[in-house]
A protein has these predicted regions:
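Phosphate- and other anionic-substrate recognition elements at nucleic-acid/protein interfaces
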Residues: 1-133
Length: 134
């Protein structure tokens, strides 16, 4: 099933959850034109059907993989530290408001972004276990 959108999305904010992603899309004027919850499997397929746009996410381990994938689809995916997104939140905290704050923050010219890491960079060596299985 392919998702077709009848409006032009310029910026997307994604709040990454364990099982679902909250998506808020803004048009060029900054008006909200998309507010949906997608499952993990729907994110890549639905975003593949959109023309390239600016996509913001809070930096976490899962965001690096998604950022690499979205960049390969032609989108401009950017990661931000959560502490820099927080000032853009309005009202009571919920996942859609977090996604909206991410969409607002990613557009700011003074925003500090986190570089997307490769899978090798994220694969940190583990300390040796003190438990012996002999």
């Amino acid at each position: 099933m392919s998702a077709k959108f009848n409006f032009e999305i310029a910026v997307i904010g994604i709040d990454i959850g364990k099982n679902s992603f909250h998506i808020v899309g803004l048009d060029r004027r900054g008006a909200i034109v998309l507010r949906q919850r997608w499952s993990r499997g729907q994110v890549e397929t639905r975003l593949a059907n959109l023309p390239p746009c600016l996509i913001g996410m809070e930096a976490c381990v899962g965001a690096h993989h998604l950022s690499r994938k979205l960049t390969s689809l032609g989108h401009d995916a950017r990661l931000m530290p959560a502490k820099y997104v927080r000032p853009y939140s309005r009202g009571q905290k919920n996942d859609f408001r977090d996604a909206e704050a991410i969409a607002e923050a990613v557009q700011r010219p003074t925003m500090k972004f986190v570089a997307t890491k490769s899978a090798e960079q994220l694969d940190l060596p583990r300390p040796p276990s003190s438990v012996s299985f002999a």
